[in-house]
Structures are given as C-alpha cells and as structure tokens.
Swiss-Prot record:
PROSITE patterns in UniProt: CADHERIN_1 (PS00232), CADHERIN_2 (PS50268)
Organism, scientific name: Gallus gallus (Chicken)
Keywords: Calcium, Cell adhesion, Membrane, Receptor, Repeat, Signal, Transmembrane, Transmembrane helix
CC terms in the record's Gene Ontology section: plasma membrane
Protein name per Swiss-Prot or TrEMBL: Cadherin-related family member 1
Transmembrane annotation, as ranges: 706-726
Signal peptide residue numbers: 1-23
Extracellular side: 24-705
Amino acid sequence: MKHVRHFIPSLFLSLVHVCLVQANYAPYFFDNGARSTNGNMALLSLSEDTPVGSHVYTLNGTDPEGDPVTYGLTYEAGSRRYFSVDGNLGNVTLIEELDREKEDEIEVIVSISDGLSTVSEKVRILVMDANDESPEFINTPYIVQVPENSPSGSSIFKIEAVDRDTGSGGSITYFLQNIHANKFTIDRHSGVLRIKSGVTLDYEKSRTHFVVVVAKDGGGKLRGDNKVFSATTTVTVNVEDVQDTPPMFIGTPYYGYVYEDTLPGSEVLTVVALDGDRGKPNNIHYCIVNGSEGSFEISNTTGAISVIKSPNQLKKEVYELRVQASEVSPEGDVSAYAFATVTIRVVDLNNHPPTFYGESGPQNRFELTMYEHPPEGEILRGLKITVNDSDQGANAKFNLRLVGPGGIFRVVPLTVLNEAQVTIIVENSAAIDYEKFKVLTFKLLAIEVNTPEKFSSTADIAIRLLDTNDNVPKFSSDYYIARIPENSPGGSNVVAVTATDPDSGLWGEVKYSIYGTGADLFLIHPSTGIIYTQPWAVLDAEVNSKYNFYVKAEDTDGKYSLAEVFITVLDVNDHSPEFNENIQEKTMIIGSPVKIEAIDQDAEEPNNIVDYSIMQADPANVFDIDQSTGEIKLKSYIRSLDIIHNITKNKDCIWSLVVQAKDRGSPSFSTTAVLKIDITEETLHKGPMAAFLMQTKDNPMKALGVLAGVMGIMVLITIMISTAMFWRNKRSNKIMPVRRIIKKRQTQQSRTVRMEWLKFKRPSNAAEKFVVEDDAKSLQNENSNNNVQAAPVPPAAPLPPPPPALAASGNTTAWRVPTVSGSLTPKFINKQLKKRGHSSTHNALVSELKMKFEKRNASMGEPHI
C-alpha cells in the first residue's frame, strides 16, 4: 500500500512531462538576406583583408515557445577554423586571417538550440578579393641576344608578369625605368621589348645593356586604402658583333728613337692594330706605305718596325713612316684598312752624366772654412765649383739642387745647359750657428731634366764654422728666491746663481757681480755664482726682512744679462716681551677691566705673539687676566667694595700682582712685572676732564700747570690773529669800516651741576658763541671823493675768559674717582724699530714671487739697468 502511494505521484509527473515534450517546437534562424549582418550567415561575403579579431556577423534566431536559445559553429573535418561564436549572444568573430588566393569559399555549420532541440545549417561564406598581391615576373632571369645590326623599332623580347588579384588589382601594365637613358621601349600592355625608334646598337661601343622593367597592377582597396603594387626585373641584352668596323691602331701617336750605337736590324718600335669588330675579329696585315726611304722595314704579322741601316748611314734626323693595317677575312679577302703615322728620330746617345770639377779637375768633395753668421746674400767665394755635361742638346740639360738643411743656402744657377760655374749664396744667416753646427754638410745634386735616363751626379760640400762671440750669458732663471735665518754668521752662503754662455773659449767664460740698493750686505763669488753675506753683516728680521738686488753675468767681451734675487730673512725668537714700565699702577672701577701691554720685538709669528698670565696675587683668586689681550678684571662674584673689604683688611683696596708676558716662540722667552691696582667704585663724574683729574689726583700741581698752559695757548692764538688782521689792513693803506659787529651771545645758565669746579659749559658748536648784527650807521662814502672820516681803531684782541667760578655748595662732596680704563704705552725701542717700516709688520714668509711683481710694478717707467 505504501508503494502504491508513491507510484501515483510519479506517474502523474511523468504524464505531465510527456505532454510538455510533445508540445515543444524546434528553434530556427532568421533569414535576413545576403547583405544582412545578422541571421544564419547565409550568403555572407567578407573581404580577405578583414582584420583578425573583427566582429563579422551576429547569429540571430528564436524559439517558438520563447525559450532562450544558444548558438554554435562547427566545421567539416580537416577544415581550418576561421570563426568563433559567442553561444549566448551569437556574435561571430574572425580568428584566422583570410586569403582569397588560397581559399575563396568557407563552409561553416551554424546551429541554434533551445536546450531540447538543435537545428543545424551548412552555409557558404564568400571571401572577396583585396589588392594584397604584387605582380610577379615569370620565367626569369631574362637574357636576350641581339645582333648589333638589328633595325630600330624591332621587337627583341616579350616580358610577362602575373598578379593573382582579381579586377583592377590583377591587371598589369609595363614600363621602363630611366627611359631617357635607354635605347629600348616596351609595350605597356603586352610587355614586348623593342629597340627604340631611331636608335641602333653598336657592339664596339657597348656589348651589354641592362634594362630595368617595372610591372604595376591597376590598384585596389586594401584595409580601406587604395593600394598599387609593383615589381621590377632586369633584362640583360647582349649585343652580338657583326663585321662592320674597320681596324684601329692603339697606342697612337707612335714615336721611335734610333741612337748612335743602335745596330742594323734592331727593332725600333711595334705598332698594334685591332679589328674594330671585337666579337669575331679578322687577322691584321701590316705594311709601310711610304717614308721609309729604304731605312726601315715592318713585320706583316706583328707590326714590329726595325732599322735596316747603320745610324751613321741615316741621312735624315726625323723619319715619318705611313703604316697601313688591313683586315684579312678567313677567305683571304681584304675587307677594311686603316693608316697610322710613325715618327722616328735619330738622336745622339745620352751616355755622359753631369760632372763636377774643381780647380784641379773632376772632384766630388769641396771644403770651406768660414765664420758663423755671414751676411745674408754673401757668396761663398772660397768654393770654386764647375759642372759640365758632355752630351749635346737636350741630353746636356740638367738641374742643380742643394740637399741638406733647408733654407740656409741657395745655389745659382738652377738649370744648366752643358756647363756653368756654380755659385752658393747665404740665405739664412741665423741658421749658420757654430753652437748648433760645427760643420755644415750638403750634397750638390745635378740631375738631367728631359732625358729618359735621368743621369745624375753629386758632390759633397763641407763648411767648417769658426766661432764668434754671438751669445749673451743666460741665467737659468729670471729670478732667484732664497731664505736665510737671521743672526746667521757673516760669510754664510745664501744661494747659488748659474748662467751659461754657449760660446767657445774665453767668450764662454762667465763672471758674476751684484749691485742694487739691497746688495750692501751680500757678496758673490765671481766664478761660481755663490752669493754669501758680508763677513761683518748682521741680518736682523726685525730691522729688515726682505732684500732684493740684481746679479750680472758677463763674458769677456762685456756681453751680459741680469737676474733678480729675492732674499727673505727668517725670524728667530731672540727677543723677550717687554712691558712699558717695570712697576705699573692702575686704577680699576668695579665692573670695568684694566689692560696691560707688552711688546715682543720679533718680526714674525708666533715669536711676537704674547700671552699674559698672573703669576702671583695677594690675596689670590681675586683677578682674572685675558691670555691674549692682557685685560685684567675682577672675579665675577666681586660686585662692590663691601665684598672686597670682606676679603682683605686692607682698607686702601690696593693689590699688588705679579704678571707675566710670555711669547710663543721656541724656545720661549718671558718677562714679569709688578702691577699695583687701586680698586674703586664708579661715580657720577665722567668725561675726559674727570679722567685727567683722576690720573693726577696725587699731583695737583701737575693739573694746575696743564690748565695754565691751555689758557696761555688760547691767549697767544688770539693775539696772533688780531696782529695779522691789523697788518693786513695797514698794508692796504686804509682801514675799512666795520659793517658787521660781532657780539657775544648771551650765555644761558648752564643746567650742568656736575663738576662745575672742573668743567666749562661748552656750546653745541662753535658758531653759537657769537651772533652777527649789521651796523645801522654805515661808513660808506656815497660821494666817492675819498672824504672819509678816519676809520675807527680796530677792537683790541679779546681777553681770555675768566676762570670758571667754583660751584657753591654747602656740603662737601666726597672725592669720587671717575671711571678710568688705562693702557700701558710701549716704551721707546732702541733697536731701530721705527726704521723697520711697514715691511716689519708683514709675515716674513710672504710669497717672494708676489713681492717681485709688486716691486716691478712700482718701478715701471724707470730705465732698466
């Protein structure tokens, strides 16, 4: 029962499925015609130049029940697969390149399926032609044999080319390249090659012609563009010879020579003639027509001409022979002939070369002794040379030439006929130099000009030179630079200069001397050139560290040259630093340093660099000193006198320090000094006067003396000015009236209350002390009659101003020391420090070359010694 329940639903479903299957209809393609791009691909045409990968068609069909359909493409067995299809969309794509020339139709089986039924159709796709083929020549290569007597316009060959394209792309036309240079023409359609009208072929001029033929198709579409293809081939046209040209002599004109020693029967020359028809040449027969006069004969077959008489029997100097060359056919007939003229000259034998002669006969070596540098244009009269050629006419003509160092001498004459006297002339005097050549050697060459033998001969010429004093001694350098330490003992070597004179003997000996403003301390050895110091000389870099002077190199004839010597005296640490005073006193304001100074008289660093230090102080640890500048200041924690009072019980606030000045030389020198420092605080009294009073507080008479001296100078200046004005007016014989009155400006009460008993109130500028007013009563003489009242006496010189009044004060102001920053002035240096000048401050190792140029620039315009 259970199985029956399951069977009934299954049977029902099977019946429903059978009903549905029986009701299904097969799908089908749409037939849209030959020009349609969708359907079943029937009658589809594709150009062979369609690119691979192109979408060429769309399969399109439907199912009557409306079910979705799929598409397929299949091929016969062994066929190439040109297309692929998208099963769902039906898009057909070209996957293989088409070639109509190989396959012009493609069979494809297209199918459509709705999943239950499949419908297949076989369709043919036509491959359309595109112009993708070039013309091709057949039966190549083309070689044509053409007789040279072929008439113009005749056909000689037919050229054929094929193009596998159809239509205009397969049609071919022919033409020739370089048509203007060709002797041929071609029919454009048939390809028949002809000799151009009015043109003949000539084997003797050109045996082969190469004709380039171009075959071009009619053009057509290829991938959307019009394309025209062409091909070229070369036709070789060989011209065949025919007997149509007379013989030709080669090597004309013909010249022969019979010499005085020629034997009878000797061959003079050979003439050669060839048949003008080179392809099948005939034999040539030679004969002398006239001009021989029984003296010459010719070989009938070879063309060799021989003399049959002795040269002594020949009556003429020149013979003109007329020779005939005839073509002889194989049958023995003379078909053509030609003539040539042969010139034979009877000449003397060139059997004598040019020969050089001296005073005693033939000679091949000539010698001469002379001084160097003779004048240009001078003739070497010591050479007696004659040259001769015993032949006659052209055989006796030759050229002369000097072979050797060029441009020194020239020979006259250059061309000689038979005989001449040889003259050698100086051309370059400077090159005739004993120092370069002790002996000048040349070869005198004589060589024939117009003879085939070119006979020649040579003679050796040796010129021994004698020396003259033609050279100036020359230093090895234009300047010499030397260094020597100061304090070197007298007679110390400084530098050695060297000069050479290439002249020989005494002229080559050099003596040295020195002179110049800087040469006082130096001597030079006259032979060796060693420069050394005077025995008594003391070199001190602090006095002078630079010397320069000239050295002179002179030969025995007085010829000389100069060089400049630069000597630098190197500094040695030989001075100790020196303070300006052994015991110094300084007043120090709290917060302001005081400075000490010591001078080291050495010329160079580091010998003259001074370092300062405090050797001893009581109490210690109160002062600091700057090692380089010598500034002494209090420790940073000392800011008032109260702190100082706490340090020491000395209420005077005076300290004694032992300071040291030490140079940086090697070995080092040092100097010590005792310095007393009076410490005070800053007050309101400032300025130069306050500083002066502070310096002279212990010597009030000195202050009064200085003030009195200043006022006396002012009075003296006023009197001198007034006297000068008086004498000027007196010399002019009149005293001009004063038109402007100078009045003293009203002084205002000074607002300065500080140091009234020490200072004057000074205006801001000198012009504020006086004002100028015009005099109301002018003394001008309006009548111009010299009736002028006596001029008033000029005012007397103003008295010096009264001394300033002391400021009244009820309270006695406590004595305050103004701020004073003192420095020690160097004491007078006894070692000619002032003479040292600016040069002593320079570094002693300044470049000597730079100093040379500076000195030379400074001395420009002065005559050179």
